[in-house]
Amino acid sequence: METDQDMHDQAMAGEETDLDEKYPNRPQNKAPTLPFHDLYETLFRPLREIKKKPVGPAGNRRKAGPHGLSAANLNPIERRRDIIERFISRWRKEVGDDIYPAFRLILPDKDRDRAMYGMKEKIIGKMLVNIMKIDKNSEDGFNLLNWKLPGQSATSSMAGDFAGRCYDVVSKRPMRTEFGNMLIEEVNEKLDQLSSASKEEEQLPILAEFYRRMNPEELAWLIRIILRQMKLGATERTFFDVWHPDAENLYSISSSLRRVCWELHDPNIRLDAEDRGVSLMQCFQPQLAQFQMQSLDRMIARMRPTEDDPVFWIEEKLDGERMQLHMVSDASAPGGRRFRFWSRKAKDYTYLYGNGIYDEAGSLTRHLKDAFADGVDNLILDGEMITWNTEQDAPEPFGTLKTAALSEQRNPFRQGIHPLFRVFDILYLNGRDLTRYTLRDRRNALQKVIKPVHRRFEVHSYEEATTKAEVEASLRKAVAEASEGLVLKNPRSPYRLNERHDDWMKVKPEYMTEFGESLDLVVIGGYYGSGHRGGKLSSFLCGLRVDEGQSSQGSNPTKCYSFCKVGGGFTAADYANIRHHTDGKWVEWNPKKPPTTYIELAGGDSQYERPDMWIKPEDSVVICVKAASVSVSDQFRIGLTLRFPRFKRLRMDKDWKSALSVQEFLDLKSHAEQEHREKEFNVENFRKKRVKKTTKKPLAIAGYDENAEVQYAGPSGHIFDGLNFFILTDSNAPVKKSKAELENLVKANGGRIFQTNDAVPDTICIADRRTVKAASLQKKGDIDIIRPSWILDCIKQSEIDAGLPDLLLPLEPGHMFFMTKDKEEIVAGSLDQFNDSYARDITVEELRNLLDQMAKDGKTDSFCSPEAIQKVTEHIQEKVDSGWTMPCGWLFKGLVLCFPENENDSASEGPEPKQSQRIHLAQNTAKFAGASVTTSLKDTSITHVVVDPDFTSSELPKLRRTLSTRRKLPHIVKVNWIEDSWKENTLLDEEQHMPVYMRRYPNIQLMKV
């Protein structure tokens, strides 16, 4: 009788035979693959430690010898590449030319040949509890199953890092303390089995084998591979570039890691010209639209219009899933055609949309029998798969797409929702690659080969335009129809594979100025944050009170429908205030017994946007929220939600009974949309290049609380993960900390404490005084001794950079109690010629001294080129759009602040008045944080007028007369709006910072932007 292992071995043998036939020249390794522990020892860990190891950047002081730079003098990018090159060179020498087994583990998110595991953190945590026979209610059981929550001990206090939690728990009960005995190839085989297992009971013994054969660190890395969350600090482009000069190009046209490894195993053999284009039945990486820029004028300029051809195209941005369709004529296939569908992430959706005309499981291809012109043998189309509601003859939100496809599979004759493929590009036709042709030529070809099928398979329309006014008109229409926005396209451009380029540019309504009303919503749920906000409720689920007419008979009168999540705009004081009024009233959400008496979520049993904690409406608070727009969403109970909601203030004058109801919201929405159609839209300065500053007055330091003590608040993080410390003394400066306090700070931030310098390798010695032990270490002369100020600076900088990757500060001369000769040049390289740190945010006093020294030296550095600044700006914006925290230097980005000149100031003599100095400080802060600053009220782009506290009602008429001709008037705020927003690192509500008399007499309040 055949066992499961026998069947698996037979399947593997059959797969190998198929691969040999498909890749007859694939490389063969000459030796077994490296042990799995070598992978993390020589690659994973060194790459992660680049951002951990406290060494200075190379900067502009690097000195190269006759053989180039030493490893210690390489900058982080060069060191990262050096590590990858060494690993690949070793693989080629010791194993062979087939690096595919290693790349599958290094870049698991790019491996399309291995199916998804169907295992997220919760399932893995439950399995580990089972495997290690831990009580789920014990401390370790709780920490594994509730990994986002703060741990119950100092070592497990960090929330939000699941693999770290697993390491913490497994290291207490490891099956192995030495390296495991699994080879990379064995790990791949077991992962293949894991991905093919369909049930948890089939996956459990496989994970148990990993636990038995790996040490805790190996298992933690394996879990990162399973979750496809490596976070190595190096992208696939870096690995591809080191592997072969054509690797990135081949991946762009094939999305196949296997092809990159097997077809490009020899770096000296380049791809042929005919192999550099898209191919039938090979998934490519599509072109993406660039993010919105400073202004419509600038975006239009990026379309590169010419005198002879000034036209650009405007397309509606569709709310669906990017999809590519490959079709080839095949006489052996029923209906004579074969189809393949892939998403932008290279997921194969052929099973959902169909592989042939008569595929009964196909929700789309069954309608494509007559969709192509005669003579079309094969093609590749690029487009968007959307959900279409036949009853409403309108699109549905993106989240309903898979439901629509499955519904169409089950019953193709029912009315309701179904997939609609909107095609906007053709890249391949009858054996010819069209990517090098212009968009206009490709569109002409598309129109000739496609025969649209109504509401099933259509060519996406576009409008030709030459002016900004035409774009603005299309934007009005887009918002009125609740569209995703617009895409501007250059019709003279080629198709750029795997590239986000200015030839296509997004214009989205949510980037416009405020939309609609401020809403008073009741808080009904809370979500724990991750990273620096881990262990605390950092965002809230808000609901709409159910009206009597909408509630079912006998239902709870306090019931609320889920409406939106709010996480922006809160200050530390706001969080504290909410905690104060709701303390002891929060209840953990139980998915098996949801509190449907009080709260109703969307999705039925799926419980969309399920909070971590919930609270009864009568026990909760009401918050005032504003947002960019209202959008359709099936993730919330009423089918609508807010785009980019932002907290304004806590409404302690209201309770749940006076919070917004469902019907009141629908009435407000209808009224706001009617007004919105009549207004002109202003596109915010979304990607504004920083303006060069010319200082006319002596530079003042932008710091509003210069006397505040430097103290550590809330020690918790990962900044010292993997580091070992020996702390010899207490800290004397910049603040006094005892030895025990320093040790607790280190442990709370991931470090380990030892009481000798030689207990473990690479121990960091910390001292601020010349004790007997410190003097003994110094006398040896081979150990660096670092001052405690470096620990405090690292923690402080980590808090400032919350949301960014944890990076240890490079050591500076001031951090060194004693250093060895070979460290002197490296440490000196962490400062520039003015002794300004390359990595650390310096204090006000340090900045003042530095500026004084610069003035004495009379030296200035040249500015970066505008092109370089723009490139860096766009790179940062991509990171922000993908979920990173907005840098403090962009807090006021896109705003134009006017500081009107006071006539009395210009006539006065003597020292600068205190209030004028305060305004000047605010101007510096605003400029530093990305705002454009002007003193002229004639500037039509002004978004805020900033006045000092002495601004009186007698000055208002003149100000209003100056601004009265504008269709949209700016906010008028006191200078402390800038000060308070900067301190809280979030844009605060303008209404709370208007001059006092304007709040007292609301009839004179100016219209908002």
Swiss-Prot record:
Enzyme class: ligase
Record-level Gene Ontology MF annotations: ATP binding; DNA binding; DNA ligase (ATP) activity; metal ion binding
Residues the record lists as binding Mg(2+) 1: 384
InterPro entries per the UniProt record, alphabetical: Adenylation_DNA_ligase_IV, BRCT_dom, BRCT_dom_sf, DNA_ligase_ATP-dep, DNA_ligase_ATP-dep_C, DNA_ligase_ATP-dep_cent, DNA_ligase_ATP-dep_CS, DNA_ligase_ATP-dep_N
EC number: 6.5.1.1
SMART domains: BRCT
Ranges of biased composition (kind: Basic residues): 51-65
GO CC term (a single one): chromatin
Cofactor needs: Mg(2+)
PROSITE patterns: BRCT (PS50172), DNA_LIGASE_A1 (PS00697), DNA_LIGASE_A3 (PS50160)
Disulphide linkage map: none
Keyword Cytoplasm listed: no
Keywords assigned by UniProt, alphabetized: ATP-binding, DNA damage, DNA recombination, DNA repair, Ligase, Magnesium, Metal-binding, Nucleotide-binding, Nucleus, Repeat
Positions bound to Mg(2+) 2: 484
Subcellular localization: Nucleus
Domain BRCT: 715-808, 887-995
Disordered: region residues: 1-34, 51-72
Residues binding ATP: 315, 317-318, 322, 384, 424, 484, 489, 506, 508
Reactions the enzyme catalyzes: ATP + (deoxyribonucleotide)n-3'-hydroxyl + 5'-phospho-(deoxyribonucleotide)m = (deoxyribonucleotide)n+m + AMP + diphosphate
Active-site positions on this chain: 317
Protein family (similarity comment): Belongs to the ATP-dependent DNA ligase family.
PANTHER family, sorted: DNA LIGASE 4 (PTHR45997:SF1)
Function statement: DNA ligase involved in DNA non-homologous end joining (NHEJ); required for double-strand break (DSB) repair.
Protein name as it appears in the record: DNA ligase 4
Gene from which this protein is expressed: lig4
